[in-house]
């Protein structure tokens, strides 16, 4: 089980990314615009650097919804491999069955 502070930190990162999404997209558009002046592009880079570090979506980590485990996360279920296996063994995931060959 992950620490509550780690789960809270991840929730904070998601909120910051949502809050600054439009501003980051706007600045990145200016930076990648070849028609913009060098000064405008440089100012956009500087403004992008002043935004909070955690507002970048690449800082987010997928975590298991039940345990908060950051590794072995399966996006399809939103759970870690351990919890997916436990749920599958109890028959709680429709259409999922153990492989046998």
Swiss-Prot record:
Family per similarity comment: Belongs to the universal ribosomal protein uS14 family.
PROSITE patterns xref list: RIBOSOMAL_S14
Source superkingdom: Bacteria
Cystine crosslinks: none
GO biological process, one term: translation
Keywords, comma-separated and alphabetical: Ribonucleoprotein, Ribosomal protein, RNA-binding, rRNA-binding
One MF term in the entry's GO annotations: rRNA binding
Ribosomal protein listed as a keyword: yes
Protein name as annotated: Small ribosomal subunit protein uS14
UniProt entry tagged with the keyword Membrane: no
Organism in which the protein naturally occurs: Salmonella paratyphi A (strain AKU_12601)
Database matches in Pfam families: Ribosomal_S14
Any coiled-coil regions, as ranges: none
Gene Ontology CC terms: cytoplasm; small ribosomal subunit
HAMAP family xref list: Ribosomal_uS14_1
Subunit structure of this chain's protein: Part of the 30S ribosomal subunit. Contacts proteins S3 and S10.
Residues spanning the membrane: none
InterPro entries: Ribosomal_uS14, Ribosomal_uS14_bac/plastid, Ribosomal_uS14_CS
């Amino acid at each position: 089980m992950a620490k509550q502070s780690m789960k809270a930190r991840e929730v904070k990162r998601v909120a910051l990314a949502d809050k600054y999404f439009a501003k980051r997209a706007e600045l990145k558009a200016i930076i990648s615009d070849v028609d913009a002046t060098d000064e405008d592009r440089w100012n956009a880079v500087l403004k992008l650097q002043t935004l909070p570090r955690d507002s970048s979506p690449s800082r987010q980590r997928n975590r298991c919804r039940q345990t908060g485990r950051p590794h072995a996360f399966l996006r399809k279920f939103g759970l870690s491999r351990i919890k997916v296996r436990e749920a599958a063994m109890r028959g709680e995931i429709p259409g999922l069955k153990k492989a046998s060959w």
